[in-house]
């Protein structure tokens, strides 16, 4: 329907398996066994787009308990989970991304890592960026593990910024639905085009499928 939130994976034309799950961080995506299903199904030559960051801040062992340690290094820490009383080793955000990348490469598939999509949030007329946090850590993880990296936050963020904050949020707002994070179909198409733009700037063979 018209008001349904749409993700960028909803608007591809090539055969795509969309395994995204709302509300998951890199850590909880792994903990829930969702990544294992992808790993075991991977075939040589598959392309795997990996994006996290929207749900990776916040509480580590209380509340939603889905955050990771900040950064892209090998840091880890043991936490006692409030809900279960069990203990869990939590790693850095970048550690989880590097694991996903290495798993994909182990299967002969091609990892493509994306910084997360921009939110409809402005500060003094400038759209919010993630260049000093999750976007930075995503880039670092991709470079460290040898994956293709697309700075989707910058590419789509630049497009939204160019629409002009001074026009008001009405124009930019049409790319989002009921909140500042989830995009409309129009926003999903914009982000998909941004991925295509980013792919064209790489030597990733997936770009050969683009029109």
State what each model feature region is.
Residues 10-15, 44:
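N-terminal hydrophobic targeting/anchoring segments and the immediately downstream early-domain regions
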Residues 5-6, 25-26, 55-57:
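Catalytic nucleophile-elbow at a beta strand-turn-alpha helix junction centered on a G-D-S/GDSL motif
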Residues 37-182, 189, 193-211:
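Alpha-helical cap/lid subdomain in secreted, periplasmic
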Residues 7, 18-21, 51, 185:
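Short glycine/serine/threonine-biased micro-segments
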Residues 1-12:
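Single conserved hydrophobic/aromatic residue that forms the stacking wall/gate
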Residues 25-37:
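N-terminal post-signal-peptidase region of extra-cytosolic proteins
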Residues 13-25:
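A short beta-strand-loop structural module common to alpha/beta enzyme folds
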